[in-house]
Amino acid sequence: MEFENKEVVNRPLVSVIIPIYNVGTTIYRMIECLEQQTFQMFELILVNDGSTDESEEICKTIIRNHQNYYLYSKENQGAFSARNLGIEKANGAYLTFLDADDKIDSNYLEILFHNCMGTDIAVCDVAVYKEDTEISRFTGGNQKITQTQALNKLLVRKEINSGPCGKMFSQKIIEEVRFPFLRVYEDILFVLECFCKVREITVTDKTTYYYMQEDTGTMGRMAKSPSVDIIAATEKIMDFIADRRDLSEECTYITISHLYQYALPVAIQNNYRGCEFILKTQILYRKYMEQILKCKAMPWKEKVIFYLYAHGYVYTNKFIKKIQR
């Protein structure tokens, strides 16, 4: 179902895409940020992903007051599906993705737009906030970097965040790219594919995207009960790394270690009894054990820990415990 407040007469320079799912009144914070933008030659595409609260009615009210705002509604499938629909509906020469409950600087669209024009992808700072306190920041200064440099920064999770937010993409390079059918970690796979379509990427610290971290959000829920989609995404990333000899070995180390940050707590919570997530993680570690053991960036102690886990043992608190099937 579609709710549009006007026909598209002139093509906007930028399409802003926001997936909506049970965000309630928190959407007003991001709408206020967009109203305050120094760059106003954009369209806003809101995609309601089957919200069960008042989100759709709130969005209908919002678009009535803005000629360049549009609302599309669909059944619930996840953020990946909502963003893909947004891409299909976008009319802008450039696209950027926002989340409804985050914030951006007033010069966000202007800075990203001008930096994106020369390289087709622009990346800015992303500040992670929890309870009004900045707890971390991805920042790469002001520079143009090669595709290989950008992929390294993305995969080692330094300077460039893994999500689609804090970035702008030209429509021509995103034309055939879509978010994969995953509930989580679909974002890093999307960004990875986009980065592979350009030779250079512009990085700027002249504007910031503010990620408002909540324990009740997707990542908070995922830490407590991780989805096997994380394993599927890790497998795709490991295959990608294996095919790219130009990438840093640290990419392997960080990718494997990141999965273990989910796997170890699951094993402890399950009292060292096997479950689907544990068993599939073990299979993945066994599949890539040669890469793990050959990785020069990985400390030998962690190689031993991953080897033990792959064969049914967990090292924790200086003890080795067997995972029961």
Predicted regions and their residues:
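Glycine-rich, basic loop-to-helix element that forms the pyrophosphate-binding segment
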Residues: K74-A90
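A conserved acidic beta->alpha catalytic loop
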Residues: C33, N48-I58
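Short, well-formed alpha-helical segments that are part of the catalytic scaffolds
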Residues: N22-Q36
